[in-house]
């Protein structure tokens, strides 16, 4: 079933463009051409999911497979979710706009412990039963999950999924697709199909495994593996080039992975343990993908992604080469994760410049002893050297991440966080420079599966006490902003993160009680109360495993019996030897460190093998000479005025998003745009007037200023080639360089308004229009931006008003004031005047801007 979006995306829906599925890079494959039809479902709002690199890569890979089709969907925002429920409309896939039950398989990204309630919400909105047992009774798509949380411990969510994809999906998902295709052609039953899938390394089918009384997960049949292997793949940067959303996303840039895996061995870090071995991407592949991607997408920023970018030895050379190649295009680079001990002048050069990105480092602990306990591999001297380098290279603020509640932590270690910041501010002062500002995030440590600290227990009460301790220490400290993670979120993460299969009923009940978007600050209290009630109703406590198995505080009671008990994730073969984790835990007790095996000796964790491969570390190539930072070309050689339309679904793209769209279009078209000056140079592109969201137009105007003269027809063709079809170009003309901008010349606008006219004849409309035209004063009270109330005369802003057609709908045309100083006669003002003279409530169906009228 295909969903009619025009009935759903009414004016009350916020940011409707996120539901269109017509972004640049979206794949629209013929439905009939596919044997297997996928939906990649991201259980977060569009702005989060559409910019997730793993989501983009798998979407591109699946659509590259023959006879396979892949669409996307995301968690609808509350307004659309409510509309779906009210209208009994099922959740749909964006590209095909078909309901999710039309597809063969739905894959959810489960990369966060609290994402499960969002998944249940999406299944419910799609009218799909929540558990695999319920779905067995009908004809529903296969439901599976992948991602870090699914790979680390799927047991709390096992009731909801037909299977789990463990590890990297680049090779695994196409293999699953082939089995589905063969199974479909052979008309296999669901159980037969799942049994075939269970033979693929990396596929875990929970129904084929039971939980023993002591908590071990074992097969309930002989033809499935006892332990399920985590899949490992090599990153393919070319698949990172993809979606360019119309709306602004949380990572509104091109992202390319440069290194997968981390061997630093931080004992708290689950991603570092679950993604081994480390695999560097060839520098040439990174450079080629970024250069191609920036030109194909029009982004003005790119990010190099890794768990630790600084451990990619080619980073300075790769970054410098890209910056040099794109020097004249006002491009900036951000590094989301870098080691402070590797931050130097070379890295500063590649991320500095006019659009200097922020710097974020993670010392994690405030004392050397605690950093050794967690095997951070960072000394005070290295920390100071890195921060000093940042100051010397022009940064005046830095973000730092710390954790509290770590194993073996004392109040001295907690206070050490404040003392470290105080020390850094003092030591990093430079003459004639203001002191360095810090933004701190203090997170609460929650133990994760497959780490040496997986046996440890944490205390919410201790989190609260230590947060108060730090608040006292930071009180009055200037230039320091401190953010604390909500302890309720940490409690929910810890409860579910190391749970077993019995928690499925708690997850389900929490969702039924209103949990969802649990980590969003405005939902936290509601979610926490729902989880609390669900836990209580289940006869458990927030510390249910402590109640059953005793205290887990490894630094108080390192009971060997506790360490040898089965864990809910022991049946997953991640490559890390459980005995090695136990030994590393003992090393932590002694604050003994383990070197990084990518650059020093093997730590014998167990990963390096035929199944998982070995570390791939590429030596640092020579760093090219720095060509210098971007210097904005402010030359103004030509001004071009373009008349364009905004029709169809592009009407649902906001004005601010349209501004960003034109910036990217100009970059993709390689038009030599002139830039403004200052610290934040921007392209000289000026849209004459903002059009209301949802309105169409055939008379919009935008001005471009270029650094060199271009033939108008060439300019028109280049622009058209990169614009969406629903942004047609009608006319292009050159205007004098010193001519006023269209924004200043704008005087009037002509609109067509379409009303519901049932029960209203032509004469009535004519009488109402005549009454308005005969009036000299029709006042309306307006509140200014400053809050002042002023009275305006709407009638003096109306120049023309006539009736075009009347049938079941009446079409009116008016010309009114449209100036950028706020003098603007809007369509709803015309509705207000009509309702005054008619004494009736009228229904405006839509409006269209015919043209903008410029003055002399």
Located regions from the model:
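Radical SAM enzyme core and accessory elements
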Residues: 2-27, 34, 38-40, 477-631
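Canonical Radical SAM [4Fe-4S] cluster-binding loop centered on the CxxxCxxC motif
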Residues: 248-284, 604-617
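Core RNA-modification/binding signature centered on pseudouridine synthases
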Residues: 634-637, 658-660, 770-856
């Amino acid at each position: 079933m295909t969903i009619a979006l025009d009935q759903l995306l009414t004016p009350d829906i916020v940011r409707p463009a996120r539901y269109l599925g017509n972004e640049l890079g979206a794949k629209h494959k013929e439905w009939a051409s596919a044997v297997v039809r996928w939906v990649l479902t991201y259980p977060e709002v569009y702005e989060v999911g559409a910019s997730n690199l793993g989501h983009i890569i798998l979407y591109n890979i699946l659509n590259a497979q023959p006879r396979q089709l892949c669409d996307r969907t995301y968690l609808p925002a509350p307004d659309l979710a409510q509309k779906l429920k009210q209208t009994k409309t099922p959740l749909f896939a964006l590209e095909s706009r078909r309901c999710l039950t039309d597809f063969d398989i739905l894959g959810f990204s489960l990369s966060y412990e609290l994402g499960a309630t969002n998944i249940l919400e999406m299944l419910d909105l799609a009218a799909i039963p929540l558990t695999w047992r319920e779905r067995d009774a009908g004809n529903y798509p296969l439901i599976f999950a992948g991602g870090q949380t699914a790979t680390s411990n799927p047991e709390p969510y096992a009731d909801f999924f037909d299977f789990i994809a463990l590890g990297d999906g680049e090779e695994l998902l196409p293999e699953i697709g082939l089995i589905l295709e063969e199974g479909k052609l052979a008309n296999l039953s669901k159980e037969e199909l799942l049994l075939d899938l269970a033979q693929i390394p990396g596929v875990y089918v929970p129904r084929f495994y039971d939980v023993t009384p002591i908590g071990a997960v074992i097969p309930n049949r002989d033809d499935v593996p006892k332990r399920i292997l985590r899949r490992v793949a090599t990153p393919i940067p070319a698949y990172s080039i993809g979606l360019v959303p119309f709306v602004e996303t949380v990572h509104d840039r091109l992202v390319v992975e440069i290194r997968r895996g981390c061997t630093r061995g931080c004992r708290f870090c689950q991603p570092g343990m679950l993604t081994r071995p480390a695999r560097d991407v060839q520098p040439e592949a990174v450079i080629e993908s970024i250069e191609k991607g920036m030109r194909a997408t029009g982004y003005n920023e790119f990010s190099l992604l890794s768990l630790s970018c600084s451990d990619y030895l080619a980073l300075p050379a790769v970054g410098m080469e890209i910056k040099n190649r794109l020097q004249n295009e006002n491009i900036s680079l951000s590094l989301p994760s870098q080691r402070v001990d590797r931050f130097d002048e070379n890295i500063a050069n590649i991320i500095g410049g006019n659009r200097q990105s922020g710097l974020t480092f993670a010392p994690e602990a405030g004392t050397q002893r605690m950093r050794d306990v967690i095997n951070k591999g960072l000394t005070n001297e290295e920390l100071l050297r890195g921060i000093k380098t940042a100051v010397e290279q022009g940064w005046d603020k830095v973000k730092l991440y710390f954790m509290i509640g770590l194993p073996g932590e004392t109040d001295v270690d907690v206070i050490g966080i404040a003392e470290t910041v105080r020390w850094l501010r003092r030591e990093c002062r430079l003459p004639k420079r203001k002191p360095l500002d810090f933004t701190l995030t203090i997170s609460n440590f929650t133990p994760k599966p497959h780490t040496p600290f997986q046996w440890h227990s944490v205390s919410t009460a201790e989190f609260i006490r230590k947060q108060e301790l730090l608040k006292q220490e930071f009180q009055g400290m200037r230039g320091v902003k401190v953010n604390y993670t909500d302890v309720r979120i940490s409690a929910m993460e810890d409860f579910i993160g190391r749970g077993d299969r019995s928690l499925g009923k708690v997850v389900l009940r929490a969702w039924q009680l209103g949990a969802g978007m649990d980590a969003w600050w405005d939902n936290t209290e509601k979610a926490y109360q729902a989880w609390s009630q669900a836990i209580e109703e289940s006869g458990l406590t927030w510390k249910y495993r402590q109640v059953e198995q005793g205290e887990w505080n490894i630094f108080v009671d390192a009971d060997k019996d506790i360490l040898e008990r089965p864990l809910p994730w022991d049946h997953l073969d991640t490559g890390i030897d459980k005995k090695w984790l136990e030994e590393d835990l003992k090393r932590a007790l002694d604050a003994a460190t383990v070197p990084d095996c990518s650059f020093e000796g093997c730590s014998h964790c167990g990963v390096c093998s035929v199944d998982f491969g070995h570390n791939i570390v590429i030596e640092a190539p020579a760093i090219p000479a720095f060509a210098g930072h971007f210097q904005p070309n402010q030359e103004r050689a030509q001004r071009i005025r373009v008349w364009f339309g905004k029709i169809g679904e592009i009407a649902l793209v906001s004005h601010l998003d349209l501004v960003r769209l034109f910036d990217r279009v100009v970059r993709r078209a390689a038009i030599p745009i002139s830039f403004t000056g200052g610290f934040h140079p921007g392209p000289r592109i000026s849209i004459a007037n903002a059009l209301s969201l949802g309105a169409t137009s055939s008379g919009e105007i935008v001005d471009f200023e270029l650094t060199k003269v271009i033939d108008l027809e060439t300019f028109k063709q280049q622009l058209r080639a990169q614009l969406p079809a629903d942004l047609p170009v009608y006319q292009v003309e050159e205007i004098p360089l010193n001519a006023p901008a269209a924004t200043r010349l704008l005087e009037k606008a002509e609109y067509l308004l379409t009303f519901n006219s049932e029960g209203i004849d032509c004469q009535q409309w004519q009488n109402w229009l005549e009454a308005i035209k005969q009036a000299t004063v029709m006042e309306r009270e307006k509140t200014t931006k400053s809050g002042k109330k002023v009275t305006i005369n709407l009638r003096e802003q109306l120049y023309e008003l006539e009736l075009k057609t009347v049938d079941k709908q009446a079409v009116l045309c008016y010309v009114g004031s449209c100036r950028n100083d706020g003098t603007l006669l809007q369509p709803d003002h015309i509705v207000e005047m009509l309702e005054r003279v008619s004494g009736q409530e009228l229904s405006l169906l839509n409006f269209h801007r015919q043209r903008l009228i410029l003055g002399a």
